[in-house]
Amino acid sequence: MSIRSGSAATLVHTVTRQDIEDFARVSEDHHPNHVDDEYMGRTSYGRVIAHGILLMGFMSAASSRMLLDAADDTPGTVVSYGYDRVRFVAPVFVGDEVTVDYEVVELDADTGKGRSNVTVKNQVGDTVAVATHLI
């Protein structure tokens, strides 16, 4: 793999009601925060919010995009060892366009292990989630 410090990818996705409903179905997380308009209408959020873990799925997709973009004929497999310091700092609503910026910030040439910074922002530039990805 031609992955090095500075390797990066960006993913842009508009969150739909169908995304949230599909994620609720697959994950079996049907908490009212994510699926009940009436319930959330009575809260300070005013409407349903996307699952934080759905945002992590977008983080993973950005990681995969970076890996595919950086791939060459060199043998080797980069895998995810998990995410540290994950924070969901603002809600994401139906119709929000999220941009995931993923960048490798450290990579050990001998072991191939490293870490990446991941930031998710909404369409107005507010940070909605952050994480450190261990690869």
In which residue ranges do the predicted regions lie?
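Hydrophobic small-molecule pocket/channel-lining residues, especially in calycin-type beta-barrels
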Residues: 12, 40, 78, 119, ...
